[in-house]
Amino acid sequence: VRYGLRVDGSNLEEMNSNTRTEGFGDEVKRRIMLGTYALSAGYYDAYYGKALKVRRLLAENFIDLYQKYDVLLSPTSPCTAFKLGEKVNDPMTMYVNDICTIPSNLVGHPAMSVPFGKGSNGMPIGVQILAPPMQEPVMYQVAHALEMASE
């Protein structure tokens, strides 16, 4: 491993295992396990084929939207940011709070989140900017404008 975290081991397999054990938080490990289970024998055909179809349909819908709009805006999360460490032992809340980012992740289009004001609890509100493929410069311009407007 020449980039990122590297945890030593007596051989390559042990090094990879140690690095992944130390480098991934509990939430990432849970999601990897869920994905592995869903794609395991008996579930692959039931879920993977349907997921590919949904992904294709979503991508087509996004392309249609980009014919009318330069970028799309959405909340990044259904609520404000949590205080550091506040929800680490609540996996369902952690999962639900990135629900707004799933469409952009599925279609593989550029997306980013920027802070846009604060909620009544004083915590930041995130707005997600989604752009067509290869239109990152437009996305960055919108992000900059939103950040300037919210200061």
Segments and roles (model prediction):
Residues 2-106:
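Serine-dependent amide/ester hydrolase catalytic core
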Residues 33-60, 68, 106-151:
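Structural helix-boundary/capping segments
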